[in-house]
Every structure is written in C-alpha cells, then in structure tokens.
Amino acid sequence: MKERYGTVYKGSQRLIDEESGEVIEVDKLYRKQTSGNFVKAYIVQLISMLDMIGGKKLKIVNYILDNVHLSNNTMIATTREIAKATGTSLQTVITTLKILEEGNIIKRKTGVLMLNPELLMRGDDQKQKYLLLEFGNFEQEANEID
C-alpha cells in the first residue's frame, strides 16, 4: 500500500554551516500523512448494523459484504439471486433488505444495491466524498425511475 503525504509549509529558518560559517536560509516543510487507498470499516456502524440483524439475515448481510464491488460500493443482484446464493427464503431477503434500507445501510434500485460508504469503502477521503454523493443520489435516481 502506498502512503500519501500532504506537504505543509512551516516558514523559513536560518542555519549556519559549521565548516564555512555561511548563513543559509531554508524552507521548513513537513509531511502530513493522509488516508491512503485502503478499505475502511467503520466499526461503530458495523456493530449497530449487526445488532439490528440476526440468524439467516446475517447470512444475507455477509453475502452483500462479500460481493459488493468496492470500486463503487454497488452489488448487482436480484432478491431471488441473493436468496438462492445464501440458501434463504425470498421473504427473508426482502425483509433484510428493507431493514438495511431503513437503517440507511443500503439503497436499492431494481437489481442493484449500494452500500453506504460510511460503513465500508475502499479509497481515500476524496473517494469517500464522491461515494457519499453517489449514495445520496442513488435513492434520488431510484425515485425518478419509479
């Protein structure tokens, strides 16, 4: 993983070369580490989500977490496909997805769901801002379709 640094200017300073006695003016720059490209799991939100769900519903949540595309936090699957893949009933999938929607954990359109980037995402702060905008617009787009 490549770390990223932001350069911060802290002014200038005069130094004296011990050998020559020459006065040298230098700029003081510091590097501040910023978020790199990694997967963030926000534990508080993850735990609160798991508290809302139990049993077979947890199987569905794990399936979503395992199959979401971290490039855009989406998963393309119908409720029937999720039910078949997890060995749960269609009604359990529908109920679980409704709970996740009401908890602002996912947003859905026909055949596609998007996971809230405050819960899980891969990328830096800029990517999170972008995904949060997409997450906000996801529901709006879904409402325009309906």
Swiss-Prot record:
Q: Which UniProt keywords apply?
A: DNA replication, Plasmid
Q: Which domain of life is it from?
A: Bacteria
Q: Which GO terms describe its biological process?
A: DNA replication; plasmid maintenance; regulation of DNA-templated transcription
Establish whether keyword Amino-acid biosynthesis is in the entry.
Answer: no
Q: Name one Pfam family in it.
A: RepL
Q: Which GO terms describe its molecular function?
A: DNA binding
TM spans (from-to) = none
Whether rRNA processing counts among this entry's keywords is: no
Q: Which InterPro entries match?
A: HTH_CRP, Plasmid_replication_RepL, WH-like_DNA-bd_sf, WH_DNA-bd_sf
Protein name per the record: Replication and maintenance protein
Origin species: Bacillus subtilis
Gene name, per UniProt, is: repL
